Amino acid sequence: ASLYASTAAYYLALASKGAERAHYAGLAKKAAYFALSWYYTWDVPFAPGQMLGDIGLKTRGWGNVSVENNHIDVFIFDFADVLRWLSKEYNEPRFADFAAVISSSMRQLLPYEGHQCGIAKKGYYPEVVQHTNWDYGKNGKGYYNHIFAPGWVVASLWELLSPGRPEEFIGR
């Protein structure tokens, strides 16, 4: 929810001026700080033989999705844009620095020839990345889940890899 709140306040700040803009910018900042508390600042150790460890996955910069199922995934959408904007708005480089960490982390599992990330299908990007012992009953720690939601996964990566789109669109 905090990711959505920070993004919504960011959009409203972009569309506002004066005191109203400052108000929404402040809300975006508060929500972003809370959202960042769900992002990994370290790399989860994987045992030898676990696929994610074998391919060298680094969890730093990935978001922990929920307390219920405790997996990481690419759920980012415009949040990196929010962080870069907050960095400029408040002269706080830590926001942009962590946006860069998130961006590099999300790119790790983009499959291309010679780098299939343990997946046999070109173009597949997993929705659920199991970094803990909890899972939905398929695979477990160190593996991907078989569940795949291509719509939002593609949309999220599209936004991540298209920096500045909201500012360009709302600024028209």
Task: List where the protein language model places each region.
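Terminal, non-catalytic domain-edge segments
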Residues: 11, 23-42, 53-172
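Short coil/turn connectors between adjacent alpha-helices in alpha-solenoid helical repeat scaffolds
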Residues: 16-19
